[in-house]
Amino acid sequence: EAFATFMEYAACDAFMPQWQLWTTFGLDRSAAFDVDSLHSTRTIEFPVNSPADADGMFDVLTYQKGGAILRMLEQYIGPDRFRAGVSHYLKTHAYGNTETNDLWDAIEHVVSTDGGPIVPVRRLMDSWIWQAGYPLISVRIDGSELVLSQRQFTFDNSPDATLWVVPIHVRIGDTTSKVLLETDEIRIPLSDTSATIVVNANGPGFYRVEYSADLLLRITGSTLSSLDTLERYNLVDDAWNAVVAGAMSSDAYIAFLQGFTNERDLAVWQIIAASLKSLSRIVPTESEPDFATFVKTLVSPSIAHFGWKPIAGEEDLTAKLRGLIVQLLAIHGKDTDAQRQCRDILFNNTVTEPELVAAATNVVAATGDATDYEWFLGRYRDPSTPQEQIRMLYALAEFDSAELIARTCDFALTSEVKTQNAPFLLNRCIANRKHGEQAWNFVRQNWQ
């Protein structure tokens, strides 16, 4: 299943590289990071003694984490060598049965005999397959040396003594090299201690990176635009998870995000938006105007760049990005003009582009009143398309009203809502910025 996940993205990326599928994969694997950051996580592979054990394997750790470590290995040894190793594995075991180690041994055989750098593939992969969790790579300069060290990353910031064999791409200035971190620390001589240093260059590693303050400042300054999309995505994702783990303050994170006012990539904005949505749930009432001003300042340059209306010939991902930043501006930035334009889109059909219509739907719901709620409910009951019906249903969970969220929770358990849709509707109610706890209590009280 992990290999199938890897091939799903590899094949599509080879067919349509402009879709940036490996960047999308970087976003998708975040779910595996989240689960693997808990002490209750599990190893990717474990003995299966019952059907229940087998069922337990069908999760993000098998699919996303498993696919991610295959991608990490492929990028470290090189796609051609990886492909040759898989080919050797298939030919060697044609019409036979195999175990996991057979794949690692086949790849290791190729990289040990083709004249290239020798990599201990089985030992490397065993440290990821048979150990739960993943490492945080700390990066600092000590004198004339770059120091990389590892410890387990957990949300409660209480790592155990687990060590991994970590394949790392390090870019120092304009030169990228590969290092294998096999112990708790490795030191790399530097010819220029003032160079910009990027660890997890190109972003294939299944680990988080923690830079010292001076090294982070070098990256988030004028050189930020020189990072590729996945590198910038990982930079934000790692910083946000440092906040979740209590290793970075929310104030420091907001200051960090100010360097992204010129960001124009969907994937990076998706992690920024997710973090801002989470922050909005804990912002004190008296600080909400300041938070809204910050969001508006952060988003406005992108709104000005992309505009409100689609442009003929623009990239497919631009429409999704426009919808995302419109929601940020209108909901979290509390921009009244953006809210008005969203109402025009939804009620007057001033724009029919699907991503903007979807964004306008969420904005009107999040900023709407009881009259708007009745309109959404009516459209759900009499939709023009099945897609519109689902959009209207989920919008019922966005309203900023305890009474309306209570109605939505009750509505989820009626015969008007399909049983396969009810859990997703309740999940969205729980995710409501102001009334999530109310929805959670409803679920607890009605759990059977």
Language model segments and positions:
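Hydrophobic alpha-helical and helix-loop surface patches within well-folded domains
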Residues: 1-151, 155-157, 278, 285-305, ...
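Short coil-to-beta strand junction motifs in C2/discoidin
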Residues: 160-166
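Long, ordered, helix-rich scaffold segments
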Residues: 12, 28-31, 37, 66, ...
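Intrinsic disorder/low-complexity segments enriched in polar/charged and small flexible residues
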Residues: 21-24, 130, 166, 239, ...
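Residues that act as N-cap/strand-start positions at coil-to-secondary-structure junctions
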Residues: 131-133, 162, 180-184
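Preference for bulky hydrophobic residues occupying beta-strand positions
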Residues: 139, 168-170
